[in-house]
Amino acid sequence: MKRRSIFMYYCFCFLLKYVAFSNVPNPNTTIGHFEICEVNTSSGDAEECVLENEFGKMFLFICDIDYNEMSKNIVLPSECAKKTYIDHVNPNGTSPEVNTYDIFPDLIAANESQFRDKFYFYGTPYSSKDIDFICLCFSETKPDIKHVMKMSFKKMTKKIKGCDFGDNIPTKKDLTNGKALYENSSCHIYAYPGDVIGINCYKKDINNIYNNNLELQPNNCFHNVYYEDDILLSSKNLIPNSRVIPDPSNDVKLSKMHSYMSYIILPDEINENVKISCACKRDEYIGTMFLYVNTSKNILTSPDNNVEEIAPLNDHYISIGDMWDMGLHENPEQIQGIISNHANKKYYEHMKIYKSNKMDSSDDDESNETESSENESNERTHNGNRANKDANNSEKMTGNRRKKNNSINNTNYYSNYEDDNGINISTHDKYYEDQHFGNNGPLRKKRTFWQNMFGTSSSYYEVFNYFSIAFILIIHMLLL
């Protein structure tokens, strides 16, 4: 009986804590690309603002104060958002602070308010982990009532199309293609309506000498871009309705690290194909990003073309960028002339012979029908076998290249591998999970005891629901 009483007492205290002292969630207000959440420090109840990450959004936390009371608000950590509390259910002034950018370098945030009552954040295009960043805001006249400002990020499986010239390790890289500026290099990205494209020059390690003498060219890429290699034009005019993050405004003063990265959001409709570029420069070395923006994903096909004739074409055999430079994206019929001199030439020749023999067989003389039928059958079988053999060899070669490329990417992610035909495989678009060096398995996040029991959410409202259900079940069992 005594044990049961003690157990009931602790359960009551637990419920009292979460019912009587839980924060009041505040609704968010959306205006254009802004999502705004406000807490009132003069309130007698602890309020909580939660903003879920969404790329393309700008988040604004307002720690409102009552100027009539002439009180001053206090923010913890004092350097929010450079330092924050991470994944705390109910942080307080004694909770450990962490350097936000060491844990999550992709967060773009700043505070330029003289009274420290407004905090700006950009939604990030990629997150390698589930994580919550928390700052506290309260009035000096009510220090016991601490209001919560929380930014919540969910793990994403796909990285963003783009070029990272910062020599970053996979866990700190949010773009698909990695390069190091120890030599001149180039990176080719093929983009389509609705895509998000990024470029980064910065090595995401604080005070790393790699970041000395860095330069983004143009310095406000993608707001301005190079067209035809040397003509500086506005992306708004080249790609109407596109949007660049961060935008050129006084809302957020970018840190040094975030001054060397940029993203462009392509519109859902693109009327013209266009080739643009930006570059990263480190000392005498330049890494150039070539961005091929297409009106649709099927730039090599047209309504008059047979899809079967185009389907075997593969980036490992012929570069789409080369076709673009030669103007072939506007005249797909010329592609067949290139293919005839390419690695899969025999496959097309045999298929052409097969089709012509099939059509000619219907015009043969009836007296030679049997002989012609046998010859046609033999030739069809012979050519068909050769075609199948060449097709299988083609697929096998592609598979070997992909396996070899994946192996090299896992062991040395910044190596620049070229296959037998001289095509730089590492510069082609590819999505992959963060991986250990030399290990094909994805990185695994360490989970706490409570996350193993109740999931990875850091919201104590969800934890409270679980405990409430468990408490009711226990009471029910005790009363039986």
Curated annotation (Swiss-Prot):
Keyword tags: Cell membrane, Disulfide bond, Glycoprotein, GPI-anchor, Lipoprotein, Malaria, Membrane, Repeat, Signal
Biased composition (Low complexity): 406-415
Top-level taxon in the UniProt lineage: Eukaryota
InterPro entries xref list: 6_CYS_dom, 6_CYS_dom_sf
Residue ranges annotated as propeptide in the record: 458-480
Membrane topology: Lipid-anchor; GPI-anchor
Family annotation (SMART domains): s48_45 (SM00970)
Cellular compartment(s): Cell surface; Cell membrane
Lipidation, GPI-anchor amidated serine type: 457
Compositional bias (Basic and acidic residues): 377-393
Matches recorded under Pfam families: s48_45
Region described as Disordered: 358-415
Cellular component, GO annotation: cell surface; plasma membrane; side of membrane
Disrupted gene: phenotype observed: Cells lacking both P36 and P52/P36P show attenuated infection and do not form a parasitophorous vacuole within hepatocytes.
Biased composition (Acidic residues): 362-376
Disulfide bond positions: 37-49, 63-137, 80-135, 163-187, 201-280, 221-278
Domain 6-Cys: 23-156, 159-298
Glycosylated residue positions: 28, 40, 92, 111, 184, 294, 368, 375, 392, 405, 409, 424
Signal sequence region: 1-22
Function of the protein: Involved in sporozoite infection of hepatocytes and replication therein.
Name used for this protein in its record: Sporozoite surface protein P36p
Organism: Plasmodium yoelii yoelii
Recorded name of the encoding gene: P52
